[in-house]
Amino acid sequence: MIEGRYWRRWVFFYVPVTAFVVALLFPFYWMIVTSVRPDKELYRPWNAANYAPFWTLHPTFEHVRDLLTQTLFGTWMLNTMIISLSATVISLFCGLLAGYALSRLRFRFAGLIGTGIFITYLVPQTLLFIPLSDIIRNFKLGDSPWALILTYPTFLIPFCTWLLMGYFKSIPKELEECARIDGAPRWKAMLYIIFPVALPGILSAGIFAFTLSWNEFIYALVFLSSPEQKTIPVGVTSELVRGDVFYWGELMAGALLGSIPVAFVYSFFVEYYVSGITGSVKG
């Protein structure tokens, strides 16, 4: 019986988990191998002698060097960081206030308004970038970071509000009521009691907003045109693909280096992210 349980555990747990992990990590492995593979191996026919598709025989960093010296990758990285952090701060500020008001204050149609805010998040971006581009053109913000800093919150604020609403609802109201009884105004109770308790939810909303801003492509492609203003997703794909020529080594190096900040954020705040998501769902 013990042996049967052992095999069932392998068949129904270890094998699926192993397959899932391999499928999840293989793209990153492929990016690493391609970024350090010399050109003579990248374009070698599959039936050639000593052909090794899953590893390289002569690793080199020439593609990383060319990416950093012959392109504006450093500028793209800085632009992406500034835009992502700015959009995240704006979205968190508005989402905190809206989520607190809709979950902790009593007024008519609060639930209906919260549902409406989340529905706006479900609207496809392809339907919004045309009117948004008209607004950006009227305010003369085209081809500038402000075009993205002011448009990203249009889809980040609804989700942050919905996520924080669920987390605020899971916090006992007695904590806030005790502070109010002791004479603290509502804004102090919110700032010094509710927000510290809701820190996992706030961090999870911030991680989501930062990741989505970092990887966003459609708005950055439409609103930014000059190479000096582009973000990493647009800069790498537009400057390293010329006609029908794909610079695969530089492309994979750019994708790999561009994913480091997001991986760094998730690795340090993954516990807060998971607890924030589960807390919001439970609420």
Task: Identify the meaning behind each predicted range.
Residues 2-283:
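A structural signal for multi-pass alpha-helical bundles of membrane permease subunits
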